[in-house]
Amino acid sequence: SLCTAVTFWLILKWEENYDQPHSTRWLVLIAYLIGVSVGVHLLNLLCIVAIVLVYYFKTSEKPTVWGSLIAVGISALIIAAILYGIVPGIVKVGGWFELLFVNGMGFSFNTGLIVYIVLLVSAIAWSVYETQNGTREWAINISLLLTIALTGMPFIGHKASGVIFGIIVLALIGAYLFSSSIPEKFKPSKWLLNTIMLCVMTITIGYSSYAVIVIRSTANPPMDQDSPEDIFALGEYLAREQYGDRPLLYGQVYSSEVALEEREDACYPLYNVKGKSYGRKEKTSANEKDSYYVMDEKRSYIYAQNMFFPRMYSPDNRHKSEYNHWVGGIKGRKVPYNSCGQMKTVTVPTQLENLKFFFRYQVGFMYWRYFMWNFAGRQNDLQGHGEIERGNWITGINFIDKMLIGG
C-alpha cells in the first residue's frame, strides 16, 4: 500500500512540475519504486495504468476516447515487459550464462552469473551514456538492443519458443531503429530513449533487492523455502513454482482425466515439458570440476476433458465437497473418455454450474463480501463459510438487510 500510494503521488508531482526543467526525474523515481515494489507485491504494477493515463492527459492537447484506449494498451505492454520480461528475464539470461561458463567452459559456480552482471551493468551504463551524450546513431541503437537482450525482456516463454520469440522481437526492433526508410518523426527521440534506459536502469536497481533472498538462503536459516542459493533456484522461487499451477482461461476441471497415449502395449500420460530444473552436482573427488545437472523436468500434464474459464479444477476431495456446497449440488454432464481402448464416462460440471461457483464463491464470498465490509457494513465478527448468520456484509438499512440475510 505504501509503495502504491507513493508511486501515484509521484506521478502527481510530475504533473505539477511538468513544464519545469528535469521533471523527468519524477518518472525515473517512479520506475525505481516499481522495481523495489516487485520484491514486495506485484499489485503495485497496476499503478502503471493510472500513470500512463495521467501522462497522456497531461501531454495531449486534445485527449480522445481512442487515445485513452491506446494509452491503456501501452500501459499493458509496459506491465508485460516488466512482469513477463525483466522480472523472469534477468534470472533466465543469467542462468544461460551460468550454464555456459560452468558446464560449458569448466569454471567454478557463479562465474557465469558474475560475468552476466558485469555485462548487464556495462550495457545499461553504455546505453544511458549513448542516449544522453552520444552522436553515433549505430552506437545508440546497438547499446539499446544489447540492454534489451541482456535484461531478458523479449525472451517471453519457455524453452526454444521463448528464445525464438526473443530473437524475432530483437530483429524487429533492430530493423525499426536502423531503417533509413522510416521518417525521423516516426522514430523515438534521444530524450525518450534516454528516459526509457534510465527507467530500465532504476527498475533493475530496485529489482536487485531480491539478492537479499539469495544472501539469506546461503546462511541456511530455519525457514528457507525452496533454498534459493543459486540462480536456478532463485528463478523457481520468483516464478512461485512451490504454489503449483492452475488453469485460468482454459483447462481441466476437478474430475478431468490425464490424456493417455498407447505405446508398445502400454499407456503413458501425455504432458508438455516447460523447462528443466537444474541443481548443483555433488562432487565425488576434490579434483572434480563444478557442474550443474538436470534434477527434473518441469512437466505440465495434458488433460482429456477441458473447458473454458474453469473455476472448479482442484481434485482434492475437500475442495470437491466445497464446490458441491457452493453450487447447490453438481449434476454435471457425462463425457465419454477413451482410456487406451477402454471407453469410460467422466462427469464434468456444466458451464452454468462453473459460473455459479464463480459468482457465488469467488466473486460474492471472496471479493464482494470483503469489499462491502469496508464500504458498507459487517454483520458480525464470526468466522463464516457461507452461513446466513455468520460474517456476511450488511448495509445498515433494515429492509435491504432483511432481503440479504433475513430477519
PLM feature spans:
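Alpha-helical transmembrane segments of multi-pass membrane proteins
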Residues: 1-9, 27-30, 43-49, 172
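Cytosolic-side transmembrane helix boundary signature
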Residues: 120-139, 160-199
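Transmembrane signal-anchor helices characteristic of membrane glycosylation enzymes that use polyprenol
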Residues: 35, 41, 82-83, 200-219
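Short hydrophobic alpha-helices at membrane interfaces in multi-pass membrane enzymes
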Residues: 17-35, 64-77, 136-147
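Membrane-interface transmembrane helices that cradle and orient dolichyl/undecaprenyl
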Residues: 7-26, 53-64, 125-135
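Transmembrane-embedded, aromatic-rich helix segments that form part
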Residues: 43-55, 88-91, 165-169
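Lumenal/periplasmic acceptor-binding loop at the mouth of the active site in multi-pass
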Residues: 217-407
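Membrane-interfacial interhelical loops
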Residues: 1, 84-113, 142-166, 215-233, ...
